[in-house]
């Protein structure tokens, strides 16, 4: 199938709107991606004609809704090549998935004197839960430092492991720098030390295929809303043997086998024991539509288009005076920058006046900002629906801001 950005853009209604009298150039998909009509329509159709509470319902609508939900679990397992659909837990997003692991597996397996390894480039969602766990149990948090070019100092990683290292929690792709970490060698090294590995895949799954069996990671988590799906839904993958050993984190309906006031409660099997309460079934249906949409386009086709667009963007941005770029030359999805001494918020506001949407701030990565000694950065992210013309508008906008502000 030949990739056509014009055909893709036609599927996204919001891309036809104007902002400040100019066509919208949406360069903020790393924060949250726009949704194609196929996703919007699938969720709306479910609410119009198929909604019911899932699980245990004997009536037709409930049975059909349950089947649709479980079919999405199967589709998601194929999307990341999990061995079984029962290795996937529906969560609200990447943040909840990481917190689930920290509060279930972490509480059961990390003790005083143990340690967990993260990196200096992590999103707060892959820092704070581990800080909280370490504070609860008296464990140590160790950090892989950054290089100035936005890659990790991987030569330090072997020195961080010891017999007390329980987990390596690492991002697949940096949400600020676009750095893709060499997971295969990092996971192999961790497993040689008997250490489990959690991968934050929030910024990876939309850009190229992910194969969790080939990676051999123990946990992999991602959000639907960055993958052109709805908000409030994501996937946590856990190797089946590991998942079956983990205790539930939240209690309530749907996650129990039996409840007795005198004899206590027993749990249902995984993954359902981690899905307490009424799920976001509409969001799950929308996620399924997003997975189907992206799979039909072909992730390899998407990857090729996006990489060509990224190379073009980086080359064109060289013409902007006083522009500082952060991150390696080879990157996925995002371009973080600052313009001269001007605050990122000011630059972002000017770009918005030109109809260009970028993200400004610390990007939930304050340790990374501290490393580069800046309070904030601008971030333009490139998705499968962005165009060379939008890149040109970004470059022209930055050149204009430089002329105006000096």
Swiss-Prot record:
CDD domains, A to Z: SufS_like
Chain positions with N6-(pyridoxal phosphate)lysine modification: 226
Cytoplasm in keyword set: yes
Residues making up the signal peptide according to the UniProt record: none
Pfam family, one: Aminotran_5
EC number: 2.8.1.7, 4.4.1.16
Main location: cytoplasm
Keyword Phosphoprotein attached: no
UniProt GO BP: cysteine metabolic process
Pathway: Cofactor biosynthesis; iron-sulfur cluster biosynthesis
GO molecular function terms listed in the Swiss-Prot or TrEMBL record: cysteine desulfurase activity; pyridoxal phosphate binding; selenocysteine lyase activity
CC per GO annotation: cytoplasm
Catalytic activity: (sulfur carrier)-H + L-cysteine = (sulfur carrier)-SH + L-alanine; L-selenocysteine + AH2 = hydrogenselenide + L-alanine + A + H(+)
Active-site residues, as the UniProt record annotates them: 364
Places the protein is found: Cytoplasm
InterPro entries per UniProt: Aminotrans_V_dom, Aminotrans_V_PyrdxlP_BS, Cys_dSase_SufS, PyrdxlP-dep_Trfase, PyrdxlP-dep_Trfase_major, PyrdxlP-dep_Trfase_small
Keyword set, alphabetical order: Cytoplasm, Lyase, Pyridoxal phosphate, Transferase
Protein's job: Cysteine desulfurases mobilize the sulfur from L-cysteine to yield L-alanine, an essential step in sulfur metabolism for biosynthesis of a variety of sulfur-containing biomolecules. Component of the suf operon, which is activated and required under specific conditions such as oxidative stress and iron limitation. Acts as a potent selenocysteine lyase in vitro, that mobilizes selenium from L-selenocysteine. Selenocysteine lyase activity is however unsure in vivo.
Quaternary structure note: Homodimer. Interacts with SufE and the SufBCD complex composed of SufB, SufC and SufD. The interaction with SufE is required to mediate the direct transfer of the sulfur atom from the S-sulfanylcysteine.
Recorded family membership: Belongs to the class-V pyridoxal-phosphate-dependent aminotransferase family. Csd subfamily.
Designated name of the protein: Cysteine desulfurase
Source organism of the structure: Escherichia coli O17:K52:H18 (strain UMN026 / ExPEC)
């Amino acid at each position: 199938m030949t990739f056509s950005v014009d055909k893709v853009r036609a599927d996204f209604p919001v891309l036809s709107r104007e902002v400040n009298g100019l066509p919208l150039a949406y360069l903020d998909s790393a924060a949250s991606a726009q949704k194609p009509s196929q996703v919007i329509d699938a969720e709306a159709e479910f609410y119009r004609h198929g909604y019911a509470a899932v699980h245990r319902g004997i009536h037709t609508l409930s049975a059909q809704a349950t089947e649709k939900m479980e079919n999405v679990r199967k589709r998601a397992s194929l999307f990341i090549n999990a061995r079984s659909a029962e290795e996937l837990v529906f969560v609200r997003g990447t943040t909840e998935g990481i917190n689930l692991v920290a509060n279930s597996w972490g509480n059961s397996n990390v003790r005083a004197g143990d340690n967990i390894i993260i990196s200096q480039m992590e999103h707060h969602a892959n820092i704070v839960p581990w800080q909280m766990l370490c504070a609860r149990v008296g464990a140590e948090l160790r950090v892989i430092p950054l290089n100035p070019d936005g890659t990790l100092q991987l030569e330090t990683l072997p020195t961080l492991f010891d017999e007390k290292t329980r987990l390596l929690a690492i991002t697949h792709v940096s949400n600020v720098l676009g750095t893709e970490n060499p997971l295969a060698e990092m996971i192999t090294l961790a497993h040689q030390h008997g250490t489990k590995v959690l991968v934050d895949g929030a910024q990876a799954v939309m850009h190229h295929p992910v194969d969790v069996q080939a990676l051999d990671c123990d946990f992999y988590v991602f959000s639907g809303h960055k993958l052109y799906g709805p908000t409030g839904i994501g996937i946590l993958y856990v190797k089946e043997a590991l998942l079956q050993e983990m205790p539930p984190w939240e209690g309530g309906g749907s996650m129990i086998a039996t409840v007795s006031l005198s004899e206590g409660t027993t749990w249902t099997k995984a993954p359902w024991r981690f899905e307490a309460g009424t799920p976001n079934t509409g969001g799950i249906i929308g996620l399924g539509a997003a997975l189907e949409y992206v799979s039909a386009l072909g992730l390899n086709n998407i990857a090729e288009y996006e990489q060509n667009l990224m190379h073009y963007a980086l080359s064109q941005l060289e013409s902007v005076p006083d522009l500082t770029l952060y991150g390696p030359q080879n990157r996925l999805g995002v371009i973080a920058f600052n313009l001269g001494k001007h605050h990122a918020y000011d630059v972002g506001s000017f770009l918005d006046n030109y109809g260009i949407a970028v993200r400004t701030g610390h990007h939930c990565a304050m340790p990374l900002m501290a490393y580069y000694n800046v309070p904030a950065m601008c971030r333009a992210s490139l998705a499968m629906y962005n165009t060379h013309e939008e890149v040109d508008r970004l470059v022209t906008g930055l050149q204009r801001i430089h002329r105006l502000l000096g």
